[in-house]
Amino acid sequence: MTKKTFLLYVLLLLTAMPVSAGKDFYEGEPVYASRWRDYRRSSYFGLRFGLNVPTVRYKGTGGEAQTNPLPRYHIGLVYGNKLGDGLPFFLESGLIYTEKGTEIEATEEVEFKKCYMRYLEIPIVLKYKLNTNADDFTVQPFFGGFMAVGVGGTTKLYDSRTKIDPFGADRYKRFDAGIRVGCGMAFQNFYFEMGYDIGLFNIAGRNYSEYHYDDFDGHIRTGNLTMTLGVD
C-alpha cells in the first residue's frame, strides 16, 4: 500500500463520519448520550490515549537479534457504529498517532542502536458490548486489525554518534499491518482497554541485509502491547 492510498483511505474515513449532536433515536424517541452502555445507541465518537510497549522480532540472522522494548505513547480519535438492530455489535475505526521504539543490542556485525518510529494508524475492530449487572458498566472484547504508515522517527547509532531515519530500503519499510485483539471496559463516558497488536508484514527493507546482518534472510515483524484510556 502506497502513502497516497493510505491518505486517501484516511480522507474517506473522515468524510464518512456523521456529525453527532449528542443524541440518537430509538422508535422515534430521542436516546441521549448519558448512558453509553445502552446498545440501542447507533454510534459514538471517542478520544483515546495511552501507553505502547512495543516489540520488534528479528528472524533469520543466524541467531535472533536481541531487542528490548522502549515504551512510547499513542493518541487519536475513534468512531463506532452499531451493526444491525437488537445486537450489541459495533464496528470501530479511527485515526491514531502512535510511536514505537526498540533497543537493539550490539553484535559483531551491528552496533548498539535505539529506534524510534512514528506512525499514523487506522484500527478496524469488531466490538461486543456486554452489559453487566452494574449500572452504566460494560465489558467490551474486540477483535480486528490495523494498518499503519510510518511518518517519521529517529535511529540513534551510539558507536558512530549519528542519527538517521528509521525508514528506507536498507532499514524498515514504512507500511505495517496486522491483527488486533483485546478487551475494554466502560463506565458511563469513561473507557479503558488493554490490547495486543500482532504485525503480519515483514518490515525489513529490500536492502536490509546489505547494511546490517551479512547472513540475514529472514523477517522483521512488530508487536505492541497497549494500555488505553478514553472518553466517549
Predicted feature residues:
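Transmembrane beta-barrel strands of outer-membrane/channel proteins
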Residues: 47-53, 93-99, 126, 141-149, ...
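Predominantly the C-terminal beta-signal and adjacent terminal strand-loop region
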Residues: 96, 100, 176-232
